[in-house]
Amino acid sequence: MKAIVLAGDKQYLTPILTTIKSILYYNQQVKIYILHQNIPSDWFHEVKIQVERLGSLVEDIFIGDVIDLEWKTQGHISPIAYARYLIPRLITEDRVVYLDSDIIVHGDLSPLFELDLGDYSLAAVRDADGN
């Protein structure tokens, strides 16, 4: 299965669900890890049922208070955005793709999993606004 990681909080449930739906529209056999501090377990239960019907999985990765909610961020960005830095410690997959939780996927993500990284352990792209 392709491993995809998202991070979010309970105020971001609609964008997370939208991102999941767009991933699954174009991709099958996906394992989606969601890093969080406060997403209710009943939400995960419902999402897992829906995603499993499509042949994919959702994993609830509670990170506790590892990230201080008072950490400095810019504007609308939540401190949970720092969770991406925990991926190597929390996810044991050979390769993962981290996606922001407020995006729409418009195609097959397989090329990202097949990309030759050479000796690098990480690849990244700039945001559309150039940051």
Task: Name each model-derived stretch.
Residues 1-131:
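Glycosyltransferase catalytic domains, chiefly GT-A lineage
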